[in-house]
Amino acid sequence: MDLSVKSEANVEYMVEAIKEKLRMVNAGAMRAASFNEEMYEDLRDIYEHVMKRETFSISEMQAITEELGTLIKK
């Protein structure tokens, strides 16, 4: 998958991968359609960071979740 291309499919893929990797409890609250396309590069940066790591502390997971929250359409 070419994540350098801004598309809805790529947003969906990254959001689902992040949710799975972080084993998010409230994953239903985070839908790909909710993300602002203007923030695609920021989402991709978060995705790449999450995929590089094997484990996360609770505070890291909270920080990532908060950062994802800033990318959601208002």
Swiss-Prot record:
This is UPF0435 protein BcerKBAB4_0386. Belongs to the UPF0435 family. It holds the Pfam family DUF1128. It comes from Bacillus mycoides (strain KBAB4) (Bacillus weihenstephanensis). HAMAP family: UPF0435 (MF_00829).
